[in-house]
Amino acid sequence: EPEAPAAPEAPVATEAPVEEPVEEVVLNPYLGSNKLDGNGIPQTFFDDVHVRRAFAYCFDWDVMIDEVYMGEAIQSKVLSLPGMPGYDPDAPFYFNDLEKCAEEFKLADVDKDGVPAGEDPDDVWEMGFRVQMLYNTGNTTRQIMAEVLQANLAEVNEKFSVEILGLPWPSYLAAQRAKKIPIMTGGWLEDIHDAHNWYQPYTTGTYGARQNMPDDLKTQFKALLDQGVSLVDPAARHEVYKQFNQLYYDTVPGIPLVLATSHGYEQSWVEGRIMNPIFSGIYYRTVYKTDAAKDPTSFTDATIGDLDTLDPALSYDTSSGEVIQNIYETLVFYDGEATDKFVPQLAESWTTSDDGIVWTFNIRQGVKFHEGGDLTPTDVAYSYWRGLLQGGYSSPQWLLAEPFFGVGVDDITLLVD
C-alpha cells in the first residue's frame, strides 16, 4: 500500500524586524554646525553662566554712548527706569574688560565634561566658535551694537567668530518667536509705566520665553516678580526688585545696554507732537502743520519697519502698534505726556472699587462702527475675551491674564455693564 505523503509543516511564524525610531535632528541655521567644533555652537552654548558673563564683559558701553548716541544715553545697570522701584545707580553692573572676558571663557565648561575650558583642548577656548547675531534690517544702532561685540570677541580670541545678520522686521520677530536666535539686540517700549512692565518681559515674559530660559531660573524670577507686583508700597517694592537686580546680575540672562535720553525731531513747521513714553511711535491726532509748511495736506512718518499685524489682540511690536493706536479707539487714553492720567474715549466715565480690584467702565452712547452698527458693552467684553483666548507671551494679553487669572495675591473680576 503506498505510503501516505507526510503532512506539510506549518511555516514558522516570524516577527517583522523592529526598526529603531530615527531621532530627527533639527539644526538651527543660526548656530553654524550646531556643534562645538570651531564652526558653530551647540544649542546649549549659553547654558554656561561663564559664557554669558564673558559676552557681558566684551561689550563696550563707552563706544556706544559717545560715538553712536553722541552722549545722549546712559548705561543701563538694571532693567527698571529712573524713578521706578528697583532703579539703583549703585547696583552691580558689567563693564568693558577684555581680560575678564577671557577669564570667564576659560572658566566655562561648554562640553560639560567637568574640566574648565582653559584646561580642556576640546572646549570653547581652544576650539573657538562661530555664531550668528541678528538685528532688524535698517536699525543701524543695533547693527553697530553687534559689530562692537563682534570686534571685541575677536580681539579676545581670534577663534571667536560672530557673523552679523540683518532680517526684515517681520522675519526678525518670527525668528524670535520660533526661539531660533542665539544672540540678538532688542528693546522694550513700556505698556504701563511701572517697574513690573520692565522686569517681567526680560525674564518670565516676552524675551524670557523666546530665549528658552531654564525653568528653574524663570521660577526664581517669577517668585520675585509676584512678590513685587503684589505690593503697593514703593519702598517695599524697591527692596524686592533690588534682590531681582542681584539675581539678574549673577545669572546674566541678558546684558542691559543703554537708556537713550530720547529726543524727538521733526520739521520746524510741525507742531503738536506729544512725547509720551508709552506711545507706539507718534500719536497723529494732535499733530498739525503751521502755515510755513509747503504741503499742508500730507504728513510723512518714518517707522522702524514693516507691519507685523494689524490685529490689536496679537500686535506686540512698535511698528504695528503705531498704526493700531491711530486707527482704533480705546476705552480711555493718556492725557498728554502723563503716564498716570487719562481722558475718556469710548468710555465716558469709570469707577474703581475701594480696594482697587473692580473697575467699571460706562460705555459712551451713540458710538458707531464704520459699518454702521452701534458699539455696545458686549462688543467691549468680546474684545477682552477674544484677546485672552488668543494670548501668549508674544502678545499683549499677559497684561490682562496676570490680573484676571491671578498673580501673587491678585484677584480681579471683570464687570461689563
List where the protein language model places each region.
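Ser/Thr-rich, Proline-interspersed low-complexity disordered segments
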Residues: 1-26
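Detector for C-terminal structural segments
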Residues: 54-89, 141-151, 173-309, 315-327, ...
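Aromatic- and charge-enriched surface segment that lines or borders ligand/interaction sites
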Residues: 45-47, 348-399
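Short helix-initiation/N-cap motifs at beta->coil->alpha
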Residues: 163-174
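Short, well-ordered beta-strand elements
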Residues: 127-137, 162-165, 295-306, 358-361, ...
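Append "and occasionally in soluble cytosolic enzymes with long acidic Gly/Pro-rich linkers
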Residues: 21-33, 40-155, 218-220, 243, ...
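N-terminal lobe/hinge region of extracytoplasmic solute-binding protein
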Residues: 302-354, 385
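Surface-exposed binding/hinge segments that line
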Residues: 396-417
